[in-house]
């Protein structure tokens, strides 16, 4: 029987770029996904989107094998400073929502 930590999850991350920084934010997200995504244990892929009525908001939806492997990967990424460049590009703190499919 699988536990809650073994269930595949999706993470929806909403990022609002500072005025004039949207292209830089988009490029940074693509670069981080290409460099760190494929080698991350438990990372199943991600797609990036734009919000139609607010083009400064970008959304990334990532698939992970479990909440536990994502938490481990995020702790390591933060320790390594992977997301440090976001500070200069974001108008507000990013928002991350972790979801799983209903049983």
Q: How should these model regions be labeled?
A:
Residues 8-16, 45-77:
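Short, well-ordered beta-strand segments in beta-rich or mixed alpha/beta enzyme
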Residues 31-44, 63-97:
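An amphipathic, aromatic/His-enriched active-site/gating alpha helix that lines ligand/cofactor pockets
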Residues 17-19, 66, 100-103:
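Non-catalytic surface loops within mature trypsin-like serine protease
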Residues 1-10, 44-57, 82-103:
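Glycine-rich beta-strand-turn "strand-cap" elements at beta-sheet edges
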Residues 16-27:
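Short, surface-exposed ligand-recognition loops at beta-strand->loop->(often short) alpha-helix junctions
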């Amino acid at each position: 029987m699988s536990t809650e930590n073994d269930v595949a999850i999706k993470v929806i991350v909403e990022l609002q770029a500072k005025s004039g920084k949207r292209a830089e934010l988009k490029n940074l997200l693509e670069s981080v996904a290409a460099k760190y995504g494929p080698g991350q244990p438990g990372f199943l892929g991600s797609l990036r989107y734009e919000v139609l009525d607010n083009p400064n908001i970008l959304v990334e939806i990532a698939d992970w094998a479990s909440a536990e492997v994502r938490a481990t990967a995020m702790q390591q990424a933060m320790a390594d400073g992977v997301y440090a460049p976001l500070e200069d590009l974001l108008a507000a703190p990013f928002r991350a929502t972790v979801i799983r499919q209903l049983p």
